[in-house]
A protein has these predicted regions:
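Topology signature of small-to-medium multi-pass alpha-helical membrane proteins
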Residues: 1-142, 148-153
Length: 153
């Protein structure tokens, strides 16, 4: 029987959907103009699409990548926007659109996946002591490990 994803997971999925849609628009624009590098956006679409499917299925590895990759990419995006604005290489409107369309949704994904109901959905709450855990017992995160009681499930 499949579990229904809680609200924070749906928020993360919706935020990833915004990022995927914006990436698709940018990829189509660059492909249409004949610019090189449009395939990078296509790769990002595929990567985020796989991540989105994993989040909906309750895969722990997707939770791990979604939580931390989204945070790192959001920080990199904000730093890039700040650098572009400080060197006057970006207009404020473009930076605001990039922040609202990419960085903010990425931060929303990371925050939403850190909620207690998201931990429970991805079976990241220790059955022995009830402590939430974000540590995997193996490389692919098929089993989780509790920091507090060292239980593996």
């Amino acid at each position: 029987m499949r579990r229904r994803p809680p609200t924070p997971v749906w928020i993360a999925v919706a935020a990833l959907g915004v990022v995927i849609a914006l990436q698709a628009v940018v990829a189509l624009y660059f492909a249409r103009v004949g610019s090189l590098g449009w395939w990078r956006f296509g790769f990002a679409i595929v990567l985020f699409g796989v991540l989105l499917a994993g989040l909906l299925r309750g895969v722990r590895l997707a939770w791990l990548w979604g939580r931390y990759l989204a945070l790192v990419l959001g920080v990199v995006m904000v730093a890039s926007l700040a650098a572009g604005l400080s060197r006057h290489e970006l207009r404020w409107e473009v930076a605001a659109l990039a922040f609202a369309g990419v960085a903010a949704p990425l931060f929303a994904v990371s925050i939403a996946l850190g909620r207690p109901t998201a931990f429970a959905f991805f079976d990241l709450v220790c059955p022995n002591c009830g402590h939430p855990s974000s540590f995997g017992a193996d490389f692919l995160f098929r089993k989780a490990r509790c920091r507090r009681c060292r239980n593996t499930w």
